[in-house]
């Protein structure tokens, strides 16, 4: 195997990789062994026909695709290792030459890790945050706890109000025709949850049990179902039941029930303390973000589009995994929000770019400041990770490969870089 590297600019390179004719023939043989049992050749039992007979019958290129799938990954990885390129995105593969008895040639266009030229990263100026917890914020937090301890009661003597849980039957029509997925029975809808599109929920406020309501809405222009996007719709809705949350009184008895305190004032003081700690933590994070933004602004780097695309895909996969843990699929999320996959991915772009820029400048600070992580610090981090995963440290170490360990160490070094630039920043 041989290769050459061509710099395409903007941190993109093109590898032209050539596998020998002998290696390509070995890959064809692998493909033959994989597929021969699936091929019918007159005069031979399945799996017994010689390769030459199959190639004559089906064409000399019958095994080329599978052979390429065998040879490309191995040759690509070898070229990356030997070239010592720091690849940061999936390669774009293009087969240049595939011919029996000849070398197999393909190209791989890849994004490589950008070089960062740091500007000022110590003593950057950021706005100072003032930490204050108001009485209104304390009462809002208290109301959250009251709502968590509320009970649901059936309401029969009034119309629908905001925050009610309304049981409805509904059917949707576009241009007078019912559409797929637009019908539901005994659906429990919380008014104000924005679970349904447009002003659907608002139009139920003031309606009574047993009332038939015509709700007029317009689907979002970016709605996931293209045949409905941007179209007006009529929903025929029947209000079947109204339920409301009944909150407990905010008094000493309530404070004693939900906390270790005997009086409401003591409990409110504890809520204030918790809110202050939360605001302190948020202010620390906001300061770190602001400082990193300044460091990015002062630095010079060129991010290839392929690197951003890879980050977007990773973020989408992470988001889908979080949804799955909540019992939802990405498709259901699109349905609820009216987004489509293309818009969703586009929306991830700025955040993906910011993550990449942040990581690159912080790794550059790690290098510039010669930041290191001790063995003791690594062991402590692994112990905390093992505890979080509820496994033995030795078992975790077995599961973590060398690359994963290097990533953990770099993550720790990056956090030290954040602490450094934040501590050196000037609050004005």
UniProtKB/Swiss-Prot annotation:
Broad class of enzyme this protein falls into: isomerase
Subcellular location: Cytoplasm
Listed GO biological process terms: 'de novo' cotranslational protein folding; cell division; chaperone-mediated protein folding; protein transport; protein unfolding
All residue ranges annotated as the PPIase FKBP-type domain in the record: 163-248
Keywords associated with the record: Cell cycle, Cell division, Chaperone, Cytoplasm, Isomerase, Rotamase
Catalytic activity, EC: 5.2.1.8
Keyword rRNA processing: no
Gene3D superfamilies: 3.10.50.40, Trigger factor ribosome-binding domain, Trigger factor, C-terminal domain
Domains (record comment): Consists of 3 domains; the N-terminus binds the ribosome, the middle domain has PPIase activity, while the C-terminus has intrinsic chaperone activity on its own.
Official protein name in the record: Trigger factor
Organism: Lachnoclostridium phytofermentans (strain ATCC 700394 / DSM 18823 / ISDg)
Gene from which this protein is expressed: tig
